C-alpha cells in the first residue's frame, strides 16, 4: 500500500444524456484507491450543486479530501463530451473553472511531502494560478508521474517541456508523443526512437506510450516492454487511459515485473473502454480472468 497524491482537475463530463464526475486526476485517484492505496486529491471545486455532489462522491470513494479546496466564485469544472460511432471521445473544456484556481496551501504541501508518488498532468497548467501551485509542489514531490494531456488550445509546448523535465515517469498516447517530438523538431518515425529521444532530453528513466486498441509500449530503465492490446467492443474510451496509467503505476511502485505491469494495465484499459463511464468497478480477479481469456 502506497501514499499517492493526484493533482489537477476535478470536473463533470457532460454527455448528451447524462453527467458523470471525472477529470484525469480524479479518475487516477479512484482507480488507485480501488487497488488498495491511500490516495489524496489536490484540486478545487465550486460551491455549486455539482461541487457538492462531487465532494460526496469523492468522500464515498474513500479518497482523502483534506487538500480539496472550495472556490467562492468560480464554478465546478465541466466538459462537454461527444462520442463518435467508434466510441472515441472529443472534449469541449470550459474555462475558467474552479480547478484553474488551485492554491498552494499547507495541506497540499504536507500531502505532497508525505506521498510516495505525485501524479500530475499538463491540462492543469493551462492557468497561471494552478500552474504556479503545481510548479511549487513539484519542487518537493517524490516519484513524479506526468500524464501528458494535450487538449488544444490549452497547452504550451514550453510548459510541457518543463513538466517533462520534472518527471520521473512520463505517459503519452501515440498522437501526443508525435506532437511533442514535432514541436521539438525531432523527425524520426520509429516510436522507439521518439521514446529514447524524450528520455535523453528529459533525463527520464521511464516512459510509456499507449496506442489505443493496439496496446502500449513501456520503456523502463533502458528496456522496452510491449503489449499488443486486447480485443474489446468499445462503448466509450473516457477514462480508459487513466485506469491504464493508475494500474501501471501501482504495479511499478510495488516493484512488480514490468511486462506483467503493462499487460495488466492494457487489460484494465480495454475493460474500461468496453464499459460505460470512466470508473466502472473492476477487481484484480476480473483483470486476471480477462487476460487469461484472451491469451
Residue ranges of model-derived segments:
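Conserved phosphate-binding/catalytic region of the ribokinase-like
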Residues: 3, 188-295
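A general structural signal for well-ordered alpha-helical segments in protein cores
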Residues: 4, 25, 29, 51, ...
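Substrate-binding N-lobe of the ribokinase-like
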Residues: 4, 14-79, 83-88, 93-99, ...
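Active-site beta-alpha turn of Rossmann-fold NAD(P)-dependent dehydrogenases/reductases
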Residues: 8
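Short, glycine/acidic-enriched loop or turn micro-motifs at the edges of active sites
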Residues: 12, 47, 150-152, 176, ...
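Short, conserved phosphate/pyrophosphate- and ester-handling motifs at nucleotide-, phospho-/glycolipid
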Residues: 32, 173, 241
Amino acid at each position: 500500500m502506497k501514499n499517492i497524491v493526484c493533482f489537477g482537475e476535478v470536473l463533470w463530463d457532460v454527455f448528451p444524456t447524462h453527467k458523470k464526475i471525472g477529470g484525469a486526476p480524479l479518475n487516477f485517484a479512484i482507480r488507485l484507491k480501488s487497488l488498495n492505496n491511500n490516495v489524496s486529491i489536490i484540486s478545487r471545486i465550486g460551491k455549486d450543486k455539482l461541487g457538492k455532489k462531487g465532494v460526496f462522491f469523492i468522500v464515498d470513494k474513500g479518497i482523502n479530501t483534506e487538500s480539496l479546496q472550495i472556490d467562492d466564485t468560480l464554478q465546478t469544472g465541466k466538459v462537454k463530451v461527444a462520442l463518435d460511432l467508434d466510441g472515441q471521445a472529443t472534449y469541449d473544456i470550459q474555462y475558467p473553472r474552479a480547478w484553474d484556481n488551485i492554491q498552494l496551501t499547507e495541506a497540499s504541501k504536507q500531502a505532497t511531502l508525505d506521498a510516495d508518488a505525485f501524479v500530475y498532468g499538463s491540462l492543469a497548467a493551462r492557468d497561471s494560478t494552478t500552474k504556479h501551485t503545481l510548479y511549487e509542489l513539484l519542487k518537493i514531490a517524490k516519484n513524479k508521474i506526468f500524464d501528458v494531456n494535450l487538449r488544444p488550445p490549452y497547452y504550451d509546448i514550453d510548459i510541457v517541456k518543463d513538466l517533462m523535465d520534472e518527471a520521473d515517469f512520463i505517459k503519452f498516447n501515440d498522437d501526443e508523443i508525435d506532437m511533442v517530438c514535432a514541436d521539438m523538431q525531432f523527425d524520426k518515425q520509429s516510436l522507439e526512437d521518439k521514446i529514447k529521444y524524450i528520455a535523453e532530453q528529459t533525463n527520464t528513466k521511464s516512459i510509456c506510450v499507449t496506442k489505443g486498441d493496439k496496446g502500449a509500449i513501456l520503456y523502463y530503465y533502458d528496456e522496452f516492454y510491449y503489449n499488443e492490446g486486447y480485443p474489446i467492443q468499445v462503448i466509450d474510451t473516457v477514462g480508459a487511459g487513466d485506469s491504464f496509467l493508475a494500474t501501471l503505476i501501482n504495479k511499478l511502485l510495488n516493484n512488480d515485473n514490468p511486462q506483467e505491469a503493462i499487460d495488466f494495465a492494457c487489460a484494465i484499459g480495454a475493460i474500461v473502454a468496453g464499459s460505460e463511464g470512466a470508473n466502472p468497478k473492476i477487481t484484480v480477479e476480473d483483470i486476471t480472468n480477462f487476460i487469461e481469456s484472451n491469451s
